[in-house]
Amino acid sequence: EKYKIDIVFVSPLTRTIQTAKNIFQGKNVKMIAIDEILEYPQGVEHCNKRKNKNELQKLYPNIDFSLIPEKSSYWKDNENLYELKNRSKKFKDFLKTRQEKKICIVSHSTFLKEFLFNDVGNIEEELKHCYPYNL
């Protein structure tokens, strides 16, 4: 293994959970779902609305859903860029509280662009891209 991932944070949309499960198939790595890294915009396209927590727990028993509420608090009419920036900042602040060093984020392009290019801010702690074939 080129990388030993300590933890995976995954958007609780079905497509990202399936991606994370495929990337880490056969690997012993903890996966935690977190709403802050959901697709943008919330409240517009129904494909971006997550299932209820109870349903997700039944479908994916090996993923930790303890950090999300039963229904997403982010699903409302037409999320704006300011709200996306707030989600991104909240997730960044959350990551600073974690002890893990090698963290994988399985999310969505618009969220990740906001997070990586507008919110990380420390070149010495640059985030490395995680390619499945290097795991």
Language-model segments: residues:
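Generic beta-sheet signal
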Residues: 101-109
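A short, acidic, amphipathic alpha-helical segment used as a generic capping/interface helix at domain edges
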Residues: 84-98
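Short beta-strand scaffold positions
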Residues: 10-11, 86, 106-107
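Domain-level recognition of soluble alpha/beta enzyme cores
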Residues: 120-135
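Active-site signature of alpha/beta-hydrolase-fold catalytic machinery across serine-
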Residues: 22, 114, 118
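Short glycine/proline- and acidic residue-enriched helix-loop micro-motifs
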Residues: 60-80
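Glycine-rich phosphate-binding loop signature in dinucleotide/nucleotide-binding domains
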Residues: 2-4, 95-101
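Phosphate-coordination/substrate-recognition cap region in phosphate-metabolizing enzymes
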Residues: 2-66
